[in-house]
Amino acid sequence: MESPLGSDLARLVRIWRALIDHRLKPLELTQTHWVTLHNIHQLPPDQSQIQLAKAIGIEQPSLVRTLDQLEEKGLISRQTCASDRRAKRIKLTEKAEPLISEMEAVINKTRAEILHGISAEELEQLITLIAKLEHNIIELQAKG
């Protein structure tokens, strides 16, 4: 019998994301907000929306919706790039800085709880297998 690996992985991502959403709700944030803010925080300053979308691995229209929400919350600012008026540079606001620490604490605690009972060796094996799957998929996409 064939393993429903794709379905299993999709379900795992869905329930993991739902748990993160639930845990971030007191901060009025979602997993998508966290991923975006985390990447803005990690990347060099004044990244463009295009660079941020690539770093996160999503399409620009999806990112724009999230950035709109974060801007409404006062957590980011977007400025038109002087060298390319079509491009927007993204920066965290002062309001976002303390929130980053709170979010990271929630994420780290949740991750530790999810991985409870999994040895470092098992986790390393899982990471290696996921990397192999990703590599195979990227190669297949390149072939068309």
Curated annotation (Swiss-Prot):
Residues 49-72 bind DNA. Residues 2-135 form the HTH marR-type domain. PROSITE patterns: HTH_MARR_1, HTH_MARR_2. Disulfide bonds: none annotated. One of its GO terms (biological process) is response to stress. GO terms for molecular function: DNA binding; DNA-binding transcription factor activity. Keywords: Activator, DNA-binding, Repressor, Transcription, Transcription regulation, Virulence. Transcription regulator that can specifically activate or repress expression of target genes. Activates expression of genes such as molecular chaperones (groL, groS, dnaK, grpE, and cbpA), proteins involved in acid resistance (hdeA, hdeB, and gadA), the starvation lipoprotein slp, virulence protein hlyE/clyA. Represses expression of genes involved in the histidine biosynthetic pathway such as hisA, hisB, hisD, hisF and hisG. Required for the activation of virulence genes. Belongs to the SlyA family. Homodimer. This is Transcriptional regulator SlyA. The lineage of its organism: Bacteria, Pseudomonadati, Pseudomonadota, Gammaproteobacteria, Enterobacterales.
